Amino acid sequence: MALLSFERKYRVRGGTLIGGDLFDFWVGPFYVGFFGVTTLLFTVLGTALIVWGAALGPSWTFWQISINPPDVSYGLAMAPMAKGGLWQIITFSAIGAFVSWALREVEICRKLGIGYHIPFAFGFAILAYVSLVVIRPVMMGAWGYGFPYGFMTHLDWVSNTGYQYANFHYNPAHMLGITLFFTTCLALALHGSLILSAANPGKGEVVKGPEHENTYFQDTIGYSVGTLGIHRVGLILALSAVVWSIICMILSGPIYTGSWPDWWLWWQKLPFWNHG
């Protein structure tokens, strides 16, 4: 595959974390590196085990395939392969692949001499996954509290986990997480539409620049965060949504086991209006 005009000067030796020059090469447009190799190995292992688990199941129908965690009776012990052991090894493989990919991103950043914002942000996604399949189950004492790897069974797990606490929408951390996810979508939509509107003027008009973009929001809401600032805002909003989603799940089960609607009874007992 032909290189773009600017690519060759960035394909330089160095910046690797492990392996030195051994895996310091590209395959087509893709940088390999030591962690590219480990990503591939973990991915192949995990995928092969998923296929094995599907073969043990009742059907090859996509919607019915499910790799289930061990029964809670196994606690945190290693389960037999057909009774949850596959899920445990697949989970380990997934974490290995995700972390390897993040470290590969670090190596690419080092080669380009740029900041580590991308692997840092991706690390929050990894943490969200680990919180569901490792941290929360460990805090609750059994791998069986992790979610199954299957289309319908995963949806069932989400529904059942919510109903275990009466109504998950009353979880305050869930409220904040969902609000931040929607706010992130709004910020990205506003930013994207502004850039497209400035870059696609009417016929005969010149392409507009940051001055027009800033002025639009100053005229609309009285303030513009700026071209660099909107990306900081977007990153902060997105990572905050992930953080509160993690807190939401860690609270439910390991810390609080009651009904989330009942949790709000403290509000009714505040002395400002509680005269009973």
UniProtKB/Swiss-Prot annotation:
List of residues binding a ubiquinone: 217
Binding site for (7R,8Z)-bacteriochlorophyll b: 154, 174
UniProt cross-references to InterPro entries, sorted A to Z: Photo_II_D1/D2_sf (IPR036854), Photo_RC_L (IPR005871), Photo_RC_L/M (IPR000484), Photo_RC_L/M_CS (IPR055265)
Role summary: The reaction center is a membrane-bound complex that mediates the initial photochemical event in the electron transfer process of photosynthesis.
Protein name according to UniProt: Reaction center protein L chain
UniProt KW Electron transport keyword: yes
Record family assignment: Belongs to the reaction center PufL/M/PsbA/D family.
